């Protein structure tokens, strides 16, 4: 894949103002392996933000993901993981990572972590960073030989608004302004698998983590609903991604939750993320 570029055509509808940001100020580097000289620098910055809360995968897990080849199916899907570092004059500006999970029907991109240095916030850079995963989706589709124009959906798992966590509320409002929508949590109860160590899980019961699904259906951002079948397809891809690292027994509880999802043709509302 060629270097990541700043492509205004990939903006979410509400991120058009980000075009005012001059991308020549920064450079984007894809970290290709644990041996990359920039890996520890990038991982360290992400760890400072997400590690203490247990929200960042281990080096080993990310190393395995970076080695994935989208031309070699995993669980029947092409998968491509990208860890991106943004710098200006050699200094840290931002980092983000995400994974495309694709087949002939299209690509779902799981948005993992996004960190922007405070000095670079509220200047338009975040809109560009929300658009970069589309390039990962297209690269994944191309490597697997799937149609280049196949549908793409970006999905982030976010905690529910609580009116207390200010940073969380700001993040949800930013995605709402950009044009992302939330799958109605009153109808679809999404959970992550248990991220604790195997020893902790074995000493107790699996603890599933409730999250809301925040989506951008590229080219379909104005849609007010999707179907139960579309939700199920999306969540199945996320679970297939998690299943690459989790034990089958630890995935059983989340797989079972799909049994309670709406019927394939049932409409499921897409709501503002702060609703």
Model regions: which residues?
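Short, well-structured alpha-helical interface segments that form or flank functional binding sites
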Residues: 106-109, 124, 128, 132, ...
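Terminal substrate-recognition subdomain of acyl/acetyltransferases
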Residues: 1-36, 49, 145-275
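A conserved beta-strand-loop-helix scaffold within acyl/acetyltransferase catalytic domains
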Residues: 33, 43-118
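Alpha-helix termini
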Residues: 69-77, 102, 135-149
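Hydrophobic, Leu/Ile/Phe/Ala-enriched alpha-helical segments that form helix-helix packing faces
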Residues: 42-51, 133-141, 178-179, 242
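A generic structural motif
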Residues: 102, 115-120, 162, 220-222
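Conserved acetyl-CoA-binding loop-helix of GNAT-fold acetyltransferases
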Residues: 116, 122-144
């Amino acid at each position: 894949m060629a270097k990541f570029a700043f492509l205004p055509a990939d903006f979410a509808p509400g991120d058009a103002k980000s075009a005012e940001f001059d991308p020549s100020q920064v450079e984007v580097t894809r970290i290709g392996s644990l041996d990359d000289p920039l890996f520890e620098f990038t991982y360290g910055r992400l760890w400072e933000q997400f590690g203490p809360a247990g929200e960042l995968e281990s080096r080993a897990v990310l190393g395995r993901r970076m080695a994935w080849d989208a031309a070699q199916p995993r669980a029947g899907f092409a998968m491509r993981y990208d860890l991106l570092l943004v710098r200006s004059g050699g200094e840290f500006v931002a980092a983000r990572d995400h994974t495309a999970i694709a087949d002939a029907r299209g690509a779902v991109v799981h948005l993992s972590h996004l960190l922007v240095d405070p000095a670079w916030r509220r200047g338009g850079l975040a809109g560009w960073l929300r658009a970069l995963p589309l390039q990962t989706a297209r690269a994944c589709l191309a490597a697997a030989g799937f149609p280049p124009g196949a549908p793409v959906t970006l999905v982030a798992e976010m905690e529910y608004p609580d009116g207390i966590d200010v940073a969380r509320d700001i993040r949800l409002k930013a995605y709402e302004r950009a044009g992302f929508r939330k799958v109605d949590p009153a109808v679809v109860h999404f959970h992550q698998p248990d991220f604790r160590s195997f020893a902790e899980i074995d000493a107790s019961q699996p603890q599933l983590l409730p999250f809301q699904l925040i989506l951008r259906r590229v080219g379909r951002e104005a849609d007010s609903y999707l179907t139960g079948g579309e939700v199920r397809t999306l969540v199945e891809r996320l679970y297939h991604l998690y299943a690459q690292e989790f034990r089958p027994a630890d995935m059983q509880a989340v797989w079972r939750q799909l049994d309670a999802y709406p019927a394939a043709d049932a409409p499921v509302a897409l709501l503002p993320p702060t609703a």
